[in-house]
Amino acid sequence: MRRAVCPGSFDPVTNGHLDIIGRASRLFDEVIVGVLINQSKTGLFTVDERIDMLREVVRSYDNVRVESFRGLLVDFCHAQQASVLIKGLRAVSDFDYELQMAQMNIGLAGVETLFMPTNPLYSFLSSSLVKDVAKWGGDISAHVPEVVRGALLARLDPPSRR
């Protein structure tokens, strides 16, 4: 079975993330979306909330599941019996960082990285940008699934809604 891991913090998941996950699901028998538990960072959403949102938005994919992990990504890959990581690239600046990580992962544990260029519609999109726009009352409906939009608006209570 060809199994891959698509890792991230997904705080929150965006349509750019979903584009990569969906495309990966057509290339692999199984895709595990790995949600990083990073206790040194405080996210807007808890890990459980992120997992719930992800499970909601990927439920139409029979071969995608969502799990959390902490520690080394390559250890998570081995625990999931996945030999490939999927990483979306928005720009050359993403590549510089991700190439270093890919080389470390292959050196540490023989885990390969498949870089997928993002759809041009999402080349500018990041979770941080979505949160900033939502915080100030901007329309994020084209950038995140509806369940995420609702959760963001409820959590942030932008000034335009007060």
UniProtKB/Swiss-Prot annotation:
Its cofactor is Mg(2+). InterPro entries: Cyt_trans-like (IPR004821), PPAT (IPR001980), Rossmann-like_a/b/a_fold (IPR014729). CDD domains: PPAT (cd02163). The record marks 17 as: Transition state stabilizer. It is an enzyme of class 2 (transferase). Reversibly transfers an adenylyl group from ATP to 4'-phosphopantetheine, yielding dephospho-CoA (dPCoA) and pyrophosphate. Homohexamer. This is Phosphopantetheine adenylyltransferase. It comes from Salinispora tropica (strain ATCC BAA-916 / DSM 44818 / JCM 13857 / NBRC 105044 / CNB-440). The gene is coaD.
